[in-house]
């Protein structure tokens, strides 16, 4: 049996404990904080954030394969790929330059030799379209030299260089050739940017007509050398409109991730603030 003095002492100790900061089950600031941390809403938001980051990292920052039908039209310095579906895969590799020299041996012959300064083993197809017809000439690039059996170019003809890989046409570029005859003249140089991964080849001509067509002057009396320099990059840029699309999508993805993170942090801070206010009121 507890006498009055002991009962008063127990009551005093209980009152002090209840109004002190010593953790007691049910009123502990630690337990309240722990319950706030276990609030499922911030956890769900953080899991959603992790899912977003993982998904968009795989989509936009890793080795994705891009499938897109091309519908690019323009002058003769632009790719014509409206009937071809190209597939490109990003890869982080170095860029190398290959220099090609196409030489017309002499007037009256259709022998052309293409020389690579660096060498590149590949199979190419050149399509010559004289006066609306289509003639295909296939050859294999062995070592540093290969030979094309073609025909004399005439005004309005188009020469298409098609790179073949596993017997599938991967890229096409077109430019026009003029039938103007000169006694002698310099070699005309054009630059091409070639991306095997994205299967794009862009011609940057030196000589451009009013219509934006590259005119390669064919010398009927002397040899004509057309030097084509292009860079092979295996980390290809995406086509312009796809760049815009991916940029917008990537921006939306990043903004959504940031928004989810901010909401999760605010939920945690709000819960901690509520618990802190409740604990201060109790004290």
UniProtKB/Swiss-Prot annotation:
Residues 1-55 form the signal peptide. The keyword Cytoplasm does not apply. Keywords: Glycoprotein, Immunoglobulin domain, Signal. InterPro entries: Ig-like_dom, Ig-like_dom_sf, Ig-like_fold. Glycans are attached at residues 75, 92, 121, 157, 179, 198, 223, 229. Residues 129-227 form the Ig-like domain. It comes from the Viruses. This is Putative Ig-like domain-containing protein ORF10.
